[in-house]
A protein has these predicted regions:
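Loop-rich non-cytosolic ectodomains and luminal regions
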Residues: 100-103
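Acidic/His- and Gly-rich active-site-bordering loop/insert found
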Residues: 2-98
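Acidic/histidine-rich catalytic neighborhood of metal-dependent amide-processing enzymes
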Residues: 105-151
Length: 151
């Protein structure tokens, strides 16, 4: 199955994942619950090597078959700009997900998670080593702390 077919067949799962992750509050400096959910999700996919670093980034590295090839890094941030930690209502209407933070950047986090699901299910070993980083502290006073911790 190619990735386009996979995406079509798993679209409802992708939407449900977006709704679930969006409902977990994650203001900068308080991403612990969202990071824990993501890391556990990756472990359930078979990525036991996924971990949360000291900067609250969730990191999952997949070794490539050619260790001399350049490493590719894919990132999306887990925090939201909203300062409080109250539950965020999520509304699905006419196939559209409406919620604070869903487009910045929760949908992209979920796209990375679904990509990792595809790679796991298809047992794909990439040529290049791939690092998937769901980084923290991107918004506002977070000042890209998660990104800077990665480099």
């Amino acid at each position: 199955m190619d990735i386009k077919t996979f995406a079509k067949e798993h679209f409802e799962e992708y939407q449900a994942l977006i709704c679930k992750l969006t409902s977990i509050p994650a203001p900068s400096h308080h991403e612990e619950r969202r990071a824990a959910f993501i890391c556990e999700y990756l472990h359930q996919l078979g990525y036991g090597q996924a971990f949360i670093d000291d900067a609250k980034n969730v990191i999952c590295e997949i070794k490539g078959s050619d260790l001399e090839a350049p490493v590719h890094i894919f990132m999306a941030h887990t925090d939201t700009v909203f300062p409080d930690e109250t539950e965020i209502p999520v509304i699905v209407e006419d196939g559209c997900i409406k919620a604070s933070g869903v487009g910045d950047d929760t949908t992209n986090v979920c796209a990375i998670l679904m990509t990792l699901k595809y790679l796991s299910e298809k047992q794909i070993v990439p040529k290049q080593t791939m690092v998937f980083a769901l980084n923290s502290f991107e918004e506002g006073l977070g000042n890209l702390k998660g990104c800077r911790a990665l480099v």
